[in-house]
């Protein structure tokens, strides 16, 4: 996508955010954002994982659309962590994570590499923080069982980054869905964009793109099918 098209879709400021998130110059991005980043009136947020999505989406919208304050950021990649911290005026913890670092925050956003989502979530729940877990919440059943146990033990809130049901197009479709007793079939054809052979998504230990991305569409399918009076007895997933 060229810059001109990006500006049409996202606007100038968000496009600038995406560019900075890719090249990561030492740029005090917070100076041009609308939000007063030194505010202490809102939620205090910790950010785990400082990749492009965290930089151009999570940190951006927390800084422009809420009164939250990003207190700290950490990533195993020192450049990713330091560049996001510099851009958004947060404390850079680098990869030296200690559970005590969560004592100053209300909620932690977890958008690190996929295999680490579960353990980070468990650690912060046990520390008494609400957590927002980007998809996937777990990469295998063992992790899911551990996370489920931690959620049941904790009285803190857990949010999950399956956002497709909240898209404007799905809301339009739902408004047009009148009769919930009529049977219907839902089919999704998904074509993933190209990623290089050495991309970390392809590492089997990270859950692969099936766990990482297909979960979005399974979640959306269940949501749409729930509009009917009964849920289906099974889902059939074909990987070609």
Predicted regions and their residues:
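Short, well-ordered alpha-helical microsegments
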Residues: 55, 81, 117-118, 140-141, ...
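N-terminal Rossmann-like dinucleotide-binding module
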Residues: 7-88
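A contiguous active-site-proximal alpha/beta segment in oxidoreductase catalytic domains
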Residues: 138-198
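Beta-loop-alpha module in the N-terminal Rossmann-like domain of NAD(P)-dependent dehydrogenases
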Residues: 88-132, 136-147
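Conserved acidic residues
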Residues: 71, 106, 184
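Acidic (Asp/Glu)-rich catalytic clusters
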Residues: 62-63, 126, 149-154
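Conserved small/polar residues in nucleotide/adenosyl-binding loops
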Residues: 1-6
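Rossmann-like dinucleotide-binding domain that binds NAD(P)(H)
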Residues: 197-240
């Amino acid at each position: 996508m060229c810059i001109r098209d990006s500006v049409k879709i996202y606007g100038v400021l968000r496009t600038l955010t995406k560019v900075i998130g890719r090249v990561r110059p030492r740029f005090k991005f917070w100076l041009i954002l609308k939000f007063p980043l030194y505010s202490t009136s809102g939620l205090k947020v910790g950010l785990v994982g400082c990749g492009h999505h965290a930089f151009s989406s999570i940190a951006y919208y927390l800084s422009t659309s809420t009164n939250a304050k990003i207190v700290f950021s950490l990533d195993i990649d020192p450049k990713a962590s330091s560049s996001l911290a510099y851009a958004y005026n947060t404390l850079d913890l680098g990869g030296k994570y200690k559970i005590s670092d969560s004592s100053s925050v209300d909620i932690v956003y977890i958008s690190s590499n996929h295999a680490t989502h579960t353990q980070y979530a468990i650690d912060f729940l046990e520390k008494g923080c609400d957590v927002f877990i980007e998809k996937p919440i777990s990469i295998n059943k063992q992790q899911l069982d551990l996370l489920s146990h931690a959620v049941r033990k904790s009285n803190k809130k857990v949010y999950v980054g399956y956002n497709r049901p909240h898209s404007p197009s799905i809301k339009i479709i739902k408004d047009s869905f009148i009769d919930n007793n009529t049977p219907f079939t839902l089919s999704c054809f998904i074509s993933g964009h190209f990623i290089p052979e050495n991309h970390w998504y392809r590492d089997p230990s990270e859950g692969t793109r099936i766990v990482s991305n297909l979960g979005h569409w399974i979640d959306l399918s269940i949501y749409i099918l729930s509009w009917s009076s009964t849920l289906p007895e099974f889902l059939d997933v074909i990987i070609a």
